[in-house]
Amino acid sequence: KDADSLLQQQFPSCHNLLADLIDNNLLLKTKYSFDEENIDSVVFSYQRISDFIIAREIVNKFQDWESFAENINTDKTLHSIFVDKHWSFKGILEAMAILIPERFAHEMTDVIRFIPEDEYERVYYTCLNTISEAQINSLCWRAIESIDKETIIQFLGSKYCHINPDDWYNKLVELSTIPNHSFNADYFHALMMGLTMPKRDSIFQFFFNDCAEYDNDRCANPLRRLIDWAWSEDVSVKADSESTRLAAIILCWLLSSTYIKHRDEATKALVNLLSEQVEVLIETLRQFENVDDMYIYERLYAVAYGVALRTSSRDGLMKLARYVYETIFKRNSPPKNILLRDYARNIVEY
């Protein structure tokens, strides 16, 4: 009745609008349990759109960040979404994680300090889990300029963050090929280069070995999707150079995997991805010149040799050969790794 009355007020000339929207599957008629009573209700068929519209209406009620945050405990709707029934409003929380930074220039996780300690104890695991997941999931959908990188990094290192490390690494792979994103492959590369090889392997080997596959439902994990995309036909011609560069960085780090199947898959994917983008290959080689893992450096030169054999660019091949000669042989102190030297020699001779 309420939905029908509202539509009649807004669109008085459309007498059967509610029925038409339901018939066309834009709205869905359902039963909603409220105070042990089943009530007929109408919801959006497209849940993400519904969540976004609801979140926008809630956020727009407040003039600034202070009024929004301070009402977390006094506004019934906000308290229900963030605390009491947060598990029922994950989609709305995720939409709020997109809207709050754009409207108030604050990350949604800043609301945590407004939750009283007694409330915090009561909802420690569940509430913070839901807010943390919504915050991380929102990064795929947000305007790049609205992301406060330092605030998010501080949150990730705080006691309030309840995110499984593999979930965060999967999210970084999802974001990796987005140009200019705060958490794209350049961020991942800086993170990895800042660690020693033993530390890196202790943190990431399980992720690389487990998350470069399909899950139990045969859905590809983000790293597997990246491999499959890099293997696709004509990808080296169709992909823009910046997305190619970012994808190559992630695949290069997969070369450190102790699982030879994944190293081989990453090697072949890189050859296919870079075969017509030799300048991107050279830039990638430069980025990994100081890597302390010979697994990666050796395989990168295997990739370079594969690209040299496949590329149709004579000019690109000359640039690659010149780079390899100047980097490996010019100073008369080539690396001790015999396979790496052999790949490099074959590139120059070819």
Residue positions per predicted region:
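Alpha-helical solenoid scaffolds in eukaryotic proteins
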Residues: 74-76, 95, 107-110, 190, ...
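HEAT/armadillo-like alpha-solenoid scaffolds in large eukaryotic assembly and transport factors
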Residues: 6, 107-113, 141, 236-239, ...
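Extended alpha-helical scaffold segments
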Residues: 121-256, 265, 308-309, 321-327, ...
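Extended amphipathic alpha-helical scaffold segments
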Residues: 235-295, 299
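Alpha-solenoid repeat scaffolds
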Residues: 28, 60, 64, 88-89, ...
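C-terminal leucine-rich, beta-strand-based interaction scaffolds used for sensing/assembly
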Residues: 3-161, 197, 212-216
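Solenoid-like repeat scaffolds
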Residues: 71, 77-81, 112-118, 195-197, ...
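Long alpha-helical HEAT/HEAT-like repeat alpha-solenoid scaffolds in very large eukaryotic proteins
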Residues: 281-350
